[in-house]
Amino acid sequence: MTFSNRVSVAIIGGGIGGLSLAIGLLQNKNLDVAIYETAPKFAEIGAGVALGPNAQHALALISPAAEHAFRIHATTSLSPEFEHVWFDFRNGNAGEKDGEVLSKVENETGQQTVHRAKFLDELVKLIPREIAHFGKRLIHIQKDPVSGGAQYKLFFEDGTTASADCVIGADGIHSSVRKHLLGESHPAATPVFTGTVVYRGLIPMDVARDAIGEFADNSYMWCGDGGMVMTYPIDHGETLNVVGTRNDKGRWDGPPYTRPVDEETVRNDFMGWGEIPSKVIQLLKQPTMWAILDHYPAPYYYSGNVAIMGDAAHATTPFQGAGAGQAIEDALVLSTLFQRVTHSGLVRPALAAYNNVRLRRTQKVVATSRDALRLFCFNDRYVDGDAQRWREVWNGRMDWLWGMDLEKQNRDAVNLFADIVEKQSSARETMPKFGPVPFPVATSTV
């Protein structure tokens, strides 16, 4: 079999994960990178996105310029004593425990958030215009049997086609590439409603301060029976971002999965809560309601020369602030491996190594994020809002996520890639098929 010395990579989706991957791949001059985005331009939905210390480090390893893109728009808590505080968790129920401190969870970087659109705009500046193709909704992937040609043909809704040696789906929770990879009928091919909705809204900081004082300046989470109210500053302290959550919703009639909601509905869902969360909810104007979805765990993230990453691979609920960070970690591992892809015959070993290194960790994020919400909503059946047990559970709970040795993860991936290539070379007479490795699904131990 003849392999091409130039390798074409099609990235489906131009969100934070897809652009981070493109920035990394472009450092290998042997790769021809193209991004196919459904929208008419690069765009992100939602206000703030948080990146933990692991995600910020991953950005820096991909490209210092990518990390700078986050840094110039990042907002932290405003009080110096909150420099390393992720969230100050408080009891949000009314009554004698109203406002009780449950714990302050700290990490290296504290709570750092950025407006999604502004962050994306900065990443776009690092991408050559000619590699971006808009209005390209993928409808089908077909393997091209022609020897010596590109291995896959992509069919788009507008009637156009494209070809690539490698296809990487960064096309989000409703991923077309995931459906191609797993099969339309696979139970993990499409997202599921988690029974949770969030209400999102923004409050001008001066209005918020008038109502709740210094609580507006920093990151707080008010936890209570069946829900929580999360607040933190964005836009360099000009705005208070508010996320109110209820995890007691049995069904969602959708799509759409995001819709306007009247203010009275939100207030009713938090009626009888404690002083501060009640005041915050009263201030919300024109809130939106979001259905929270995730995926059943995929048994693998690649097949042949097709792979998925980010939300397309492991969409998670947002309750550990880790979804975007895991997409960036995916991009780091993939771009590290593809620095070693010098011909098209090395694509599959690179994707196999990526799959084996990333599957367990990312699926643990999905499982523990669901567990985190149960803790926040006082219905985990162990802590249930008890302050002492809360501190026991949260002591070191996030260390595995934030403290990941990313350089070691890269080395593990590269070493596995080398092992696969060596085995491939030692069996030239019959090209082995590097099939997906079905790791067991990680479960939480909270």
UniProtKB/Swiss-Prot annotation:
Terreic acid is a metabolite with antibiotic properties. Terreic acid also acts as a selective inhibitor of human BTK kinase in mast cells and other immune cells. It is a single-pass membrane protein. InterPro entries: FAD-bd, FAD/NAD-bd_sf, FAD_monoxygenase. Disruption phenotype: Abolishes the production of terreic acid, but accumulates 6-methylsalicylic acid. It is an enzyme of class 1 (oxidoreductase). It comes from the Eukaryota. Its main location: membrane. Belongs to the paxM FAD-dependent monooxygenase family. 6-methylsalicylate 1-monooxygenase; part of the gene cluster that mediates the biosynthesis of terreic acid, a quinone epoxide inhibitor of Bruton's tyrosine kinase. The first step of the pathway is the synthesis of 6-methylsalicylic acid (6-MSA) by the 6-methylsalicylic acid synthase atX. In the biosynthesis of 6-MSA, atX utilizes one acetyl-CoA and three malonyl-CoAs as its substrates and catalyzes a series of programmed reactions including Claisen condensation, reduction, aldol cyclization, and the hydrolytic cleavage that yields 6-MSA. This is 6-methylsalicylate 1-monooxygenase atA. The lineage of its organism: Eukaryota, Fungi, Dikarya, Ascomycota, Pezizomycotina.
